Amino acid sequence: MKKILLFLFFPILSFSQSIDHLFFEKGEINFSFQYKNKLQLNMISNIVSIDHKTNADLAYAYANQKQFLAFIKLGIDYEIIEKKIIQFENGSANNWSYYPTYEEYVDMMTSFEDSFPNICKLHHLGTLNSGREILIVQISNNVGVKENKPSFLYTSSMHGDELAGYILSLRLIDHILNGYGNTLQLTQLVDNIDIWINPLANPDGAYAGGNQDVWSATRFNADTIDLNRNYPDPQDGPHPDGNLYQNETNIFMGLADTVSFTISANMHSGAEVCNYPWDTWSNLTADDSWWQYVSREYVDSCQANSGNGYFEWSNGLNPFANGVVNGYDWYEVIGGRQDYMNYFKYCREFTLELSDDKTPDPNDLPELWDANYPSLLNYIEQSLFGLRGIVTDSITGLPLKAKAEIQSHDIDSSHVYSNLPIGNYHRHLFQGNYNITFSKNGYYPKTINATILNNSTNIEDVQLVPFSTTQVKEINPSK
């Protein structure tokens, strides 16, 4: 039995109608409105959550009751979109053409660790007020041991009704674990990268209608907050949405404080496009060429492996995008996870919009996997490329946490740091020649020159000389 989404448009509500009734069932509504220009759209995006389907003059948005009342005060005409849902019939677990119950999801995540204890560890990041958990698996050949490896992160479905990445992430975990030792690429990834995958970042939204299925999923979390507007923002600072940081937000910020991720991706659905930074402002990143390169690489592979017009997004806002877009050029997002990771955590994160259907027909999920899994693996592999090495004290040989900054290049927090306890740094760059300065309080800075080739690795270990060594030599010149 097919699930049919019927979008019914209703005219402006009279003020005599109860706003409470609109929010009784889900705590959020979906609506559309005409906007005059990008400036007005960006202003409105500070009030409500703009959705992916927005085009050159018509915007789609989500709002909780507080946000919707603020939007009404603008005096802009709108139409409520009521979704009447008839459930899809789940396919087979054997070919991943189904959405699990919440309990099945937990069992699957547990079974990954139980079946592959030498290379997989399940982390319980936190329990929500509902009792549902934020779960993540870590995959590495020496799982749980700090090594000279880049750490990579995939998360999906922080919008609870955007579930294409939920199943793809589960299948990706299964694919990597079963392929280790049997497939060269998968073995090399596990041996050389610390891989973290969280398939479901908003379980309360995904299972808003109960643990038995996802057909009543909501975009927002249980407190009707858009989690992708709830992070510290490079431009607007802490609490840009005016809300407390949600439990889910605190959990993932805590993870990013604990693990120094170098590359990550945040999976959504509702469009088919690779969205790279920034979302919050029009500034291009220092590494815009690199972002366009890896985004294009992801999309080109998807297009080649689908053969049916998949991932060819464009609209009136960017008619030449062909599946790749700068976030701000599309629409402004304030408080997004992507910009938080890039600006505050020095991690290269982009946003993957994996399907025009937010919750695809389960029977379409195998085809979605076939189109995406080579790209998902290739993006993980990007963790190995660029400039990398270990920074140590020239006297003691001990590892250092030092800043690595590229002269006349880095802007807006695009520099990186070496990470303890190893002292390893990872700087992902588009091909070219760069002067990189390493610095730390109490040490003389050191600048090196490095030539970078795309999809290649340049290893440059660096020793920093402490000030105290020079002072001792000056006092005791004979030594």
Where do the language-model regions lie?
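Sec-dependent N-terminal signal peptides
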Residues: 3-13
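Active-site/substrate-binding loop(s) of hydrolase catalytic cores
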Residues: 146-296, 300, 304, 308, ...
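Active-site-adjacent mobile loop/cap segments within catalytic or ligand-binding domains
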Residues: 264-286, 320-381
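A short, amphipathic beta-strand motif
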Residues: 387-394, 423, 462
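Residue-level detector of functionally pivotal "anchor" positions at catalytic/ligand-binding pockets or at interdomain
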Residues: 395, 465-479
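Short, acidic Ser/Thr/Gly-rich low-complexity loop/linker segments typical of extracellular
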Residues: 398-400, 406-430
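A short, solvent-exposed beta-strand micro-motif common in secreted/extracellular proteins
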Residues: 431-442
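Structured interaction patches on ligand/partner-binding surfaces of diverse proteins
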Residues: 441-467
